[in-house]
Curated annotation (Swiss-Prot):
Protein name (record): E3 ubiquitin-protein ligase ZSWIM2
Binding-site residues for Zn(2+) 1, renumbered to this chain: C234, C237, C258, C261
Zinc finger (ZZ-type): 229-280
Alphabetized CDD domains for the sequence: mRING-H2-C3H2C2D_ZSWM2, RING-CH-C4HC3_ZSWM2
The organism of origin for this protein: Homo sapiens
Highest taxon above the source species: Eukaryota
Domain notes: The SWIM-type zinc finger is required for ubiquitination activity.
SWIM-type ZnF: 54-87
Catalyzed chemical reaction(s): S-ubiquitinyl-[E2 ubiquitin-conjugating enzyme]-L-cysteine + [acceptor protein]-L-lysine = [E2 ubiquitin-conjugating enzyme]-L-cysteine + N(6)-ubiquitinyl-[acceptor protein]-L-lysine
Residue sites binding Zn(2+) 2 per the record: C249, C252, H267, H270
Function: E3 ubiquitin-protein ligase involved in the regulation of Fas-, DR3- and DR4-mediated apoptosis. Functions in conjunction with the UBE2D1, UBE2D3 and UBE2E1 E2 ubiquitin-conjugating enzymes.
Zinc finger motifs (RING-type), residue ranges: 147-198, 344-388
Gene: ZSWIM2
Amino acid sequence: MLRRGYKASERRRHLSERLSWHQDQALSSSIYLLREMGPTGFLLREEEPEYMDFRVFLGNPHVCNCSTFPKGGELCKHICWVLLKKFKLPRNHESALQLGLGEREISDLLRGIHRVQTPQPGTNDENEHVEEDGYIKQKEIDSEDICSICQELLLEKKLPVTFCRFGCGNSIHIKCMKILANYQSTSNTSMLKCPLCRKEFAPLKLILEEFKNSSKLVAAAEKERLDKHLGIPCNNCKQFPIEGKCYKCTECIEYHLCQECFDSCCHLSHTFTFREKRNQKWRSLEKRADEVVKYIDTKNEIEEKMSHFQEKQGQVYTPKHIVRSLPLQLITKNSKLLAPGYQCLLCLKAFHLGQHTRLLPCTHKFHRKCIDNWLFHKCNSCPIDGQVIYNPLTWKNSAVNGQAHQSVSNRDIIHLSKQKEPDLFIPGTGLVLKQNRLGILPSIPQCNFDELNTPQSPKDAYENTTIDNLCSIKLDNSNSKKLTYDYKISQHFPRYLQDLPTVSFGKIPSQTLLPPIVHKNIVCPTAMESPCISGKFHTSLSRMTKGCKCNNHNLKKTPATKIREDNKRSTLLPEDFNLIVNWSTAKLSLSKRYSNCMGEITRKCSHLSRQPVSHSVNTKSTELSLIIEGVQL
């Protein structure tokens, strides 16, 4: 039966430009099938720009209650959606071009004779699908399974799914089931009906919980504009990421150019493919003799050839060492991934206890086996947002930036390597040996047993050796240390100790001074020079607590005393030693302290004497100061 306004003789053979645009709108819009009103009546809901319901009836002619259909005299996007999505008609199929269909054509459409029939795997008995919680087990999802509400392929769309727990076990998008629940206006305690088997699907409360948890799977990269090719830099201008059109070399591995660099013809020797958005497949382009770029728009043929092209070229996707370096996570009994709604978006199955998940840089998580197989054999990017995992240019830069602190020069590399040598722990008195320039006397720094603030320049390089986390021995790399350590330390240090009183004393309070040596200068002549050893004692303000910090404070002196000391310091020779002894709380007798110090100094000298000899340095132009820090033994 013909409806008014339609003539049977009007048959279309070719796809018009306007109808093609409406088909593009239908395929790119978010439209949901809420209800089927007979075999040819459908209630649709469009998500954007606002949720609106539309009724579509197939017949002769087709009818839709939208505002576009009666005005244009052309099929609207809602009718196109039913023909292309619901009934899977090809865009150029004759039945998809007509303003209406006869009874025979509708009958063929309902029977699906235009589809390629594939054998369906046999279903097992329902009792074999019942799990411990009383639910039906979820059916395996294959490449042809679709969501009955949005009519999208499940494995291709990669959205979280739920399944019918009391009927057929088929999977449907969680988002689509929530839209259907809103249309049915059911209460939270009610059960939803399966749109496929018409049996109870699942409690609405469970669907809402799954929807809440699945929304947490959305990463920030998914919200980026599609014209941003995430993870892909331009190999010429280093723009990262490339925006707009992105060109990929068909012969070089992971070589990309932005629009500006491609127009500058900086890589003319090879051919390129291109894409405008990261969710699109790479399309071929050719250059004619007049150097005008010609785009090939045969989309279906190109998409088929692209996979064969990649296999033919033998392109390596993600290297194994890159994939194995991605973080792994073991699912434990307290993991949030066990909650309803969390699932691997590649296989669309829930996570289970004891499984391993792999985390991508974009924060998406998948089963380890699923994502490894994807990166090894299918694509070098995240299957959800398209962010490229590995690019030789960005990976090389990241590796260089990670070791940037070790570069600059060979001298700096050697200097840093010496500072990072393993710590040597020696119990006993800490020594600080440092080199001073000619004419400059060493000062008494404020000692911090955790870290000594000393200048670090390549010219004054030194080695750090930590002793019991108390202080550091700073050694200059010169020949003088090899010649003077054994003699000067063994000669000056014991003589100084021999001049001290040998009477035993008990525990010295931390705020008690040693008066016999406070204002006394002890001169110890040697065979080489006559060094002046100035003994200064200070009040210890700390008790070796958490930070193990000891602050040295100079005693107050009269102006006359300072002048005399300054005059004596001005006459010091470069080989002189400035020996400063700081005692802290101790509980041993002086004789025991002396023997302990001698034993530790002997071991230190034997260790220091084995230090490698560097380039020759004039010993007369240097001054070595010895600072002895008293520690609690």
